[in-house]
């Protein structure tokens, strides 16, 4: 079994419900168990206009190889209506394969670790929450990368009821 981390994000529709559904779908993948789920975080879109994103990270133990796991993540995105009209477009669901153990892969369809994860608080804050000692191959400790991104707004969101978010600065 490998330990994989998947970043989740959405900013169209009911983002919270979409992320919860996607986590359930990840848990149903063959030979895969969800071991941890971060809190949800609200973040502004990167290089684009649109509603704030809701982001999270899950830790998976899986026997799937990274390419197969990525293909299944893309299939889950498609099932949730994901379209790619242009870079940084608003999305119903975005699933990013961030890390698989300490694998370093660079192919036409898969790059591990995720090539921009070390630059994104919305990835690192939830990752560090569930894996405080996570290391990004070639970049160092995730928490050290996060410390360099204090200017990026990334707010942990606590829901007491499905429709009533409360913010908790992180």
Model-derived regions, located:
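Short N-terminal binding/cap micro-motifs at the start of the first secondary-structure element
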Residues: 14-16
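Residue-level signal for inorganic ion chemistry
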Residues: 11, 37, 126
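Short, structured patches in soluble enzyme cores that scaffold and shape functional sites
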Residues: 8-10, 62, 128
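Short hydrophobic/aromatic beta-strand micro-patches
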Residues: 7, 59-61, 100
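Short, surface-exposed acidic-centric catalytic microdomains
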Residues: 21, 25-65
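Extreme N-terminal starter segment of soluble prokaryotic enzymes
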Residues: 1-6
